[in-house]
Amino acid sequence: MTASNRPLCVDLDGTLLRSDILYESLLALLSNNPLYIFLVPFWLLRGKAYVKRQLASRVQLPAETLPYDERVLEILRTTTQRPRVLCTASDRLLVQPIADHLGLFEEVMASDGQTNLSGSNKGQALAARFGERGFDYMGNGQVDLKVWAHAGGAIVVNNGAGLVRAASRQTEVLAHLPA
């Protein structure tokens, strides 16, 4: 499978968005009712996926006002010959409306309240779905090295040359969009 027909899997937080949905949703929740600050530590006892689901079930983020990275949107708009997958550790309840708003993804993979789809969990899920080296992955952070270990190619976004070098030890770096 060549890079031209491998699915392009795109991270949300820090990659497609110049922000993080977890922080956006926490701020929205606390601005609506500051008393939730006392519940969040108890939610954390049940894990990150649980926290994300609790936030997602209580807030709505307007997809049209989120801070998208226009360079990533342009790649997605011009990459129509292969499947595009939004793959994120953010909760599906918040992510699906974003994907629907953009209309650029054929599939969404996201945290679900039980599994935090981050790092090695994300890498394993993508490899199970598309096969080892059967997808390209666009990400922005150290945690994405665990995904690039399974990917056919890497697109590094909003980070420096150090992450590009580290990614190149995992897979072929197809592009670098620095911060």
Regions found by a protein language model. Name each.
Residues Y50-R71:
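TOPRIM metal-binding catalytic domain and adjacent DNA-binding surface shared by DnaG-type primases
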Residues M1-A56:
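Active-site neighborhood of HAD-like aspartate-dependent phosphohydrolases
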